Amino acid sequence: MKLVQVQHPLVKHKLGLMRSAEINTKKFRELATEVGSLLTYEATADLETEKVIIDGWCGPVEIDQIKGKKVTVVPILRAGLGMMDGVLEHVPSARISVVGMYRDEETLEPVPYFQKLASDLEERLAIVVDPMLATGGSMIATIDLLKAKGCKHIKVLVLVAAPEGIKALEAAHPDIELYTASVDSHLNEQGYIIPGLGDAGDKIFGTK
């Protein structure tokens, strides 16, 4: 599995702000979008381009365009919605595929409850977004679902990842790519990432 920890100073700065215990919902939500955007920039660096001729202001001009790659953004409900707009800033024509997964607080296992996927998944690059990669259970289950529907090219974007989740994801899906702003220390007994961000879903949606 390709693992990329994005080292850009802006990513480090913005993620650091998100770790504050004093951060409010508005600021956390804005930063989740911004870091999601920066991760997307890194994750799409290998998209193929092709030369095309267009009519410029002074006549025909040769430009580079993305070579017809179909993309679907896959936010894992609910917290993944907080990163979705950051991806769409760069690929605004992407289709949106929604997967509902929540983690049972006792077993820590993923429980699926909703899916609405784009058509032609076998032809699309799926960019799966979720702020936290903790145990990896929800992410693995989501990728299982995408592959079962024919998707072959998958990239995962998370704000923070625990070593335990990375190891589990690599064991289950060694062919995907993982982009993260930080590889954190470990999971605590409750399955939360340390130091992490707290409950990203609650912070994005202003709930407890």
Curated annotation (Swiss-Prot):
The keyword GTP-binding is assigned to this record: yes
MF terms (GO), sorted A to Z: GTP binding; magnesium ion binding; uracil phosphoribosyltransferase activity
Keywords: Allosteric enzyme, Glycosyltransferase, GTP-binding, Magnesium, Nucleotide-binding, Transferase
Residues that bind uracil: I193, G198, D199, A200
Positions contributing to 5-phospho-alpha-D-ribose 1-diphosphate binding: R78, R103, D130, P131, M132, L133, A134, T135, G136, G137, S138, D199
Cofactor detail note: Binds 1 Mg(2+) ion per subunit. The magnesium is bound as Mg-PRPP.
Group of enzyme by EC: transferase
The reaction(s) this protein catalyses: UMP + diphosphate = 5-phospho-alpha-D-ribose 1-diphosphate + uracil
Activity regulation info: Allosterically activated by GTP.
CDD domains linked: PRTases_typeI
Example GO biological process: uracil salvage
Pfam families noted in UniProt: UPRTase
Function of the molecule: Catalyzes the conversion of uracil and 5-phospho-alpha-D-ribose 1-diphosphate (PRPP) to UMP and diphosphate.
Family: Belongs to the UPRTase family.
Name of the protein in its database record: Uracil phosphoribosyltransferase
Taxonomic lineage of the native organism: Bacteria, Pseudomonadati, Pseudomonadota, Gammaproteobacteria, Pasteurellales
Originating gene: upp
